[in-house]
A protein has these predicted regions:
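Protease-domain processing segments flanking chymotrypsin-fold serine proteases, especially trypsin-like
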Residues: 5-14, 18-49, 133
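Conserved active-site neighborhood of the chymotrypsin/trypsin-like protease fold
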Residues: 26, 30-41, 48-125, 147, ...
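Short loop/turn microsegments at loop-to-beta-strand junctions
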Residues: 42-44, 158-161, 217-218, 234, ...
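Conserved PDZ fold ligand-binding element
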Residues: 51-57, 164-172, 227-250
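C-terminal cap/linker of serine protease catalytic domains
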Residues: 66, 166-215, 272, 277, ...
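A short glycine-leucine-enriched loop at secondary-structure breakpoints
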Residues: 109, 157-162, 226-237, 258-260
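PDZ-domain C-terminal substructure recognizer with occasional recognition of PDZ-binding tails
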Residues: 200-203, 217, 230-233, 239, ...
């Protein structure tokens, strides 16, 4: 039996996980061989019925004891993926099979204490609880907030397992688990975004915020960066990005993660006693 605790700082791709019939929407997560010639990637494909929901390419695959795992049947160990880019290495592989986003839990509808569930390989449904959204696990921070859930210690979902809410809507896919039953999930919104925006690249605005601050104060700016060019100043407090409210560091992460990077932005900040609006800001796109 694999020790899943170390995966808190990374992602893993399950060899093959089939969602049980207890959940009305047939859902599976399947790892397939890389498609690009010479590319050292594994691909995680989340599929609903015959329609492709998402196809994610991890940034890099780790070797365990000098042995690289090859994909096979259900007994194949999960591929552990290094979080060097703090989950920013997830990219969408274009697929002609992408048709729809499936039945997803709307963003922000979950409340602390809401019931979550997943179905085991034995068709047994295990109940858990939604804890909240987190932008870091230990010393590892991420480019978007992950869903934190709690399941029984002896019945945690495996890596790659889809989890659902009380109305059987997809909440997210498990990225990491701990021995205490704590799980972190890639939100359904992120899966849908990656599926419907395969051309999207990571967006950078060139500003620094304090990860521990409860107020989104701009602590620093990168010279020549998008916000610096737009006249944003150190000490400004973010109000919104493209009319998305920014109340804290986590809001800032999500607001930038779900940008496609191909359209100018509008940003509002508080400067002293004034509200300042900057429009036409062109973000920097990460070419990777």
């Amino acid at each position: 039996m694999m020790d899943l605790a170390p995966i808190l700082t990374g992602i893993a791709v399950a060899g093959l996980i089939c969602q049980a019939t207890a959940v009305p929407v047939p859902f599976k997560v399947e790892a397939i061989l890389p498609q690009a010639e010479g590319a050292p990637y594994a691909t995680m494909a989340a599929q609903i019925g015959k329609d492709m929901l998402a196809s994610l390419i991890p940034y890099r695959v780790l070797k365990n004891g000098g042995v690289t795992y090859h994909l096979g049947d259900k007994s194949t160990p999960p591929l552990q993926v290094w979080a060097q880019e703090k989950l920013t290495g997830l990219h969408q592989r274009s697929s002609p099979y992408i048709r729809r986003a499936g039945r997803l839990t709307p963003s922000g509808i979950l409340k602390h204490g809401d019931k979550l569930s997943f179905a085991s390989s034995k068709n047994e449904t295990t109940q858990g609880i939604y804890v909240g959204m987190e932008h870091s696990i230990g010393e590892t921070s991420f480019p978007l907030r992950l869903i934190r859930a709690q399941f029984p210690k002896l019945a945690v979902p495996p890596i790659g397992q889809p989890c659902y809410d009380s109305e059987n809507r997809l909440v997210g896919i498990v990225l990491g688990v701990s021995r205490k039953g704590t799980c972190h999930l890639l939100p359904a919104r992120a899966i849908s975004f990656l599926a419907t925006h395969p051309e999207a690249k990571r967006v950078r605005l060139g500003c620094l915020l304090d990860i521990n601050s409860s107020t989104p104060v701009i602590e620093g700016l990168i010279n020549g960066g998008p916000l610096a060019r737009a006249g944003i100043q150190t000490g400004d407090i973010l109000i919104n990005i493209n009319d998305t409210p920014i109340r804290n560091y986590g809001d800032m992460l999500d607001a930038t993660y779900y940008l496609t990077g191909d359209k100018p932005l509008s940003i509002e900040v508080i400067r002293g006693t004034q509200v300042v609006t900057s429009k036409g800001i062109l973000p920097t796109q990460d070419p990777r």
